[in-house]
Amino acid sequence: MGSRLLQFQSYGKWFMLLSLATAICLLHLPSYSCTYSRDLPICTPQVSFQLTNTTPTATLFLSTVKEVSMLLSYVAIDLGWNVNFPKPNDYDTSNLVNTFDPSNKYHVNLFGYCKWQPLSNKATWYCMDNPNGLDIISMIVRDLGAQLGVLSHTNTKILSDSLWILYRSIFDSFYKFVHDDDYRADKVASFLQSLQQGGPLPSVDQFKTVTLLLKCFEKLTNAIQVTELCSFALIIIAIALATVACVMDILAAREEKHSATSDKLPKALFFKQITLKLSYAVVTCSLFYQIGMAVYFLALFSIRYPYDYKVKVMTFNPDTGYWLSVLRFVMEFWFAVACYIGLSLSRRRPSKEVDDLDWKDEEQTPDSGETAICVSTRGSTRIQV
């Protein structure tokens, strides 16, 4: 009865451990949503944001970019005439690019985004993959390219990627231009001052600071993606090794019923040790992920609540995917604790069984030629003459 109870406890321990690891693995899946509109348009975003026109700066900014996007829309419609000759209503404002419309709401995830556009005459909801993940600027550029692709009857994915490549080329060239030569940066500042008709002269340091912050923001979003991928891969490997260790442990327990030793017990202990180290690695990756997300939200909060409220251009909120990642981090921590406790008990088990052996007569040993009786706590008696 006692051996069955111990066996049941061992099976229950493995069942709980594998169930916890499987739940952690399933909680990683929402991070890969918000990528496709067809078939299963599920989205559990990390963050949701909207552009706002409640401040003078935001109103001026949105009106400017809207005029530019309207011009691009007209060009895109004219370029698609060979596929479908444009109709007069195609030039209506409701059919043009609305990337910068304040009514739109963007749901951003690590590898894609979804867009809710209630004022559109076409699709009010669609999702697209975005390799740049949480980089909001890259996401807006890709969305602009996708809408231009629809207007010009071109492959939206190709045009979206092409526009992003153009943006990256311009940004990298400007970054190198500003940081390599202060004289050229001063000339750019003077040119911008002439456009502002005697406004304040932008300094070279301002150009350097803005471009450097954008560069750091891009690297931060890439680092968040890498930590998520590493954490997901490690937990999958940990589940596989924990399953192997569970099978080895069960086979070793069955062999011990018929013999004193089992060659599968050291193998099970080896796989348990690797699983424990992987659980530590999973927690470490998730910790860096949470730190990266905290820095990311601090950067967005600096935009949402700037020092000068008049320059507020967007509002954002952490969304369902982020809170699920926090829950996943807590579960990963307890998974590592459970692995540590299980390995500690496995290490104590062999030594305890040896210590429980009690020779009835210390003077009568197997070498003395007399009968020696060894009683084990496992309930079996061995007699050697």
From Swiss-Prot:
Question: Which residue spans belong to the Lumenal compartment?
Answer: 35-231, 302-322
TM region(s), chain numbering:
14-34, 232-252, 281-301, 323-343
Species annotation:
Eremothecium gossypii (strain ATCC 10895 / CBS 109.51 / FGSC 9923 / NRRL Y-1056) (Yeast)
Designated name of the protein: Spore membrane assembly protein 2
Family designation: Belongs to the SMA2 family.
**What keywords would UniProt list here?**
Membrane, Sporulation, Transmembrane, Transmembrane helix
Compartments where found: Prospore membrane
Q: Could you tell me which residue ranges are on the Cytoplasmic side of the membrane?
A: 1-13, 253-280, 344-385
Provide GO CC annotations from the record.
prospore membrane
Q: Which biological processes are named by the entry's GO terms? A: sporulation resulting in formation of a cellular spore
Q: What does this protein do?
A: Involved in spore and ascus formation. Required for the efficient assembly of the precursors of the prospore membrane to a continuous prospore membrane.
Q: How does it sit in the membrane?
A: Multi-pass membrane protein
